[in-house]
């Protein structure tokens, strides 16, 4: 399992490095998102490298809407208001008003005109008066923090440009088939081969950044006495990409090569704090603490996540392993990376992992942590019954 997960990580690193080399040369790559999102591929290039020929290729072969991904600071500098204030689109794609260069264009729609508009918008000294509104180029606001905050091609294109050492702005265009349908992965593989392009996913960029960037930093340390379980050292960690504060609770001496009893736990309001009978999160957390108390050493990492208010009371996932609303594989991948960085900061390398979910093992091993043993936690009957009623049975390690 470890070899497979590490190979996946190695493949992602290699793919992103190939893509960055292409981006630096002013070439395009194909960036796919997750099957849980739009399940599509976009042509992507660095905005500062755009040419009329590139825009024409996107219009001719991509066939989708040609957009300009910009960071929030650039959007503010150019004084570009959002297209709508109440965004009700499925994936909260943040369109601003459309734009046109104030000078140097004719009708604005030609490949040359659109390339010129993009060049004007991303120029280092660009100002609001350089652009007319509306126009034929559609800017998108990328979230600060890139794919580690929002897992879309908008953020992916900006991350690729930034990681390539270029201005953080990208030009993207959805790829459609000749018959007008959206190109899915099999179509995108053929397209990439035909046009000799690198094909990578947003998940590849997430893995690359989690491997190459330090995203958490230790910001505090204190002693904590748990009722009936003695003393723990509590370490708090801040995030460089959002406002989340994570906590690691350490008992005993965790140094050395012996595997350490470890629980990586997603914080859950309903289960951990409110004690819902329909959620086993609190029970799983207490079991983890009890196991660590009995062993005399171990670590519990509690990961905070900014869950939308409307979803906070919908968390009826079993044993802290099931999905909460909007919790896709890319979100889990990001959590695994943050959890792994915290464990590495504590000096851990080999784990006895308290989990019922094999995905957690694969996820943590992707970041060079060895899971020497999986220790399952028991489930109460009520959450199991509720989850079973919601979805068809499937194989699961319990």
Where is each model-derived feature located?
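Catalytic domains of riboflavin
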Residues: 1-398
């Amino acid at each position: 399992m470890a070899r497979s997960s590490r190979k996946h990580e190695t493949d992602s690193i290699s793919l992103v490095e190939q893509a960055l080399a292409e981006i630096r040369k002013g070439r395009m790559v194909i960036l796919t998102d997750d099957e849980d999102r739009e399940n599509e591929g976009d042509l992507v290039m660095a905005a500062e490298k755009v040419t009329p020929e590139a825009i024409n290729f996107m219009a001719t072969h991509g066939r989708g809407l040609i957009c300009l991904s910009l960071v929030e600071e650039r959007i503010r500098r150019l004084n570009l208001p959002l297209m709508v204030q109440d965004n009700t689109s499925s994936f909260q794609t943040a369109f601003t008003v459309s734009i046109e260069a104030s000078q140097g264009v004719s009708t604005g729609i030609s490949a040359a005109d659109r390339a010129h508009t993009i060049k004007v918008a991303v120029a280092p000294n660009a100002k609001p008066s350089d652009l007319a509104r509306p126009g034929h180029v559609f800017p998108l606001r990328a979230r600060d923090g890139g794919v580690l905050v929002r897992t879309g091609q908008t953020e992916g294109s900006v991350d690729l440009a930034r990681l390539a050492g270029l201005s953080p702005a990208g030009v993207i265009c959805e790829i459609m088939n000749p018959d007008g349908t959206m190109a899915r992965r099999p179509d995108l593989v053929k397209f990439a081969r035909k046009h000799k392009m690198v094909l990578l996913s947003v998940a590849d960029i997430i893995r690359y950044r989690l491997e190459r960037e330090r995203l958490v930093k230790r910001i505090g340390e204190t002693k904590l006495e748990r009722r009936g379980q003695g003393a723990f050292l509590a370490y708090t960690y801040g995030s460089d990409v959002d406002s989340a504060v994570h906590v690691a609770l350490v008992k005993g001496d965790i140094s050395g090569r012996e595997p350490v009893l470890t629980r990586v736990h997603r914080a859950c309001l309903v289960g951990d704090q409110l004690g819902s009978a329909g959620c086993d999160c609190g029970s799983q957390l207490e079991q983890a603490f009890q196991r660590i108390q009995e062993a005399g050493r171990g670590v519990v990492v509690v990961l905070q996540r900014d869950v939308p208010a409307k979803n906070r009371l919908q968390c009826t996932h079993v044993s802290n392993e099931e999905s909460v609303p909007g919790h896709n594989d890319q979100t889990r991948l990001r959590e695994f990376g943050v959890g792994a960085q915290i464990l590495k900061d504590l000096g851990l390398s080999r784990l006895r992992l308290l989990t019922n979910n094999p995905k957690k093992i694969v996820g943590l091993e992707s970041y060079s942590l060895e899971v020497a043993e999986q220790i399952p936690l028991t489930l109460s009957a009520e959450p199991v019954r509720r989850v079973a009623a919601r979805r068809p049975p499937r194989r699961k390690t319990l």
